[in-house]
Amino acid sequence: MKRKIEQSIDTITGVLSKWNDVDTIVLLESGEDFYDPYFFISVDCYCTGAIPPSHTRRDLFPGAVAFESLHASRKDRFLMRDIPFRIEYKDQSYFDSLLHTGEAPEGAFRDTGTYMLYRLRHGRVVFKRSDWIDEARKDLDALNQDFWNMLRTAFQARMEHFLGDLHAAIAREDQLFYLISSSGFIRTACSVLFVINHRFEPSGRLLAAETRELRTLPDSFLGRFDSFLRTNPSLKPSQKGEVANLLARSIVAL
């Protein structure tokens, strides 16, 4: 299976690298192996210009089946040799601006935290036309404290916003909004902790495990974290709200 995966990667890389405006191709594997339910291969294609339209791309990958293209976000998804691939075409100038100015466009980290920077920093490079990726990674390693402070302020405010929503949902006994606000709260709480540790966030699939391994965590964090995540009918929503309060206060105090 490993060989089949690498052959498929080579095929896809061979197609993408022929496009003049593709500068760098980076891979991340999700899941421990092919039989892991989380398994798929994510391909980040950093571009300096236009890419072929979706109907053209569909015909360029030999053997690809179940091809789907998301026009709004410039993403392709398909199977090749039964292996799930997801390709995202990214504007290289966007990252240049972010890294050189140290300022992020509004909403840049809203939904996935710093995961896009994690991908840029830790993905496996399978093609590069220039030294752009090497320089970008140097810039990521040299981000100053002002950048991290900016992120902490933004993520902390969002965490507190979700905490307020969580308590409102508990008071109204709104089960759907309770789930939405619980998810938003714990996700942004993790975002704050990664920023405090000057680390970029992994994917949601790895977030719980890597959060537990962070060097700087509040006292009693792990027990509260596990209590908040645990599905336990005996833990009332109001009690979970109190756990969320304790988590938030301890994180803000770091």
Pin down the residues of each PLM region:
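Conserved nucleotidyltransferase catalytic core and NTase-mimicking acidic/glycine-rich helix/loop elements
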Residues: 6, 10, 131-254
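Hydrophobic transmembrane alpha-helix bundles
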Residues: 54-69, 100-118, 208-222, 235-249
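Short N-terminal helix-initiation segments at or just after the protein's N-terminus
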Residues: 19-32, 123-132, 171-172
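Residue-identity detector for threonine
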Residues: 11-13, 24, 48, 56, ...
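Metal-dependent nucleotidyltransferase catalytic core
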Residues: 1-109
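Generic hydrophobic secondary-structure signal
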Residues: 27, 43-45, 80, 85-87, ...
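Conserved NTP/Mg2+-binding pocket subregion across the NTase superfamily
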Residues: 4, 63-170
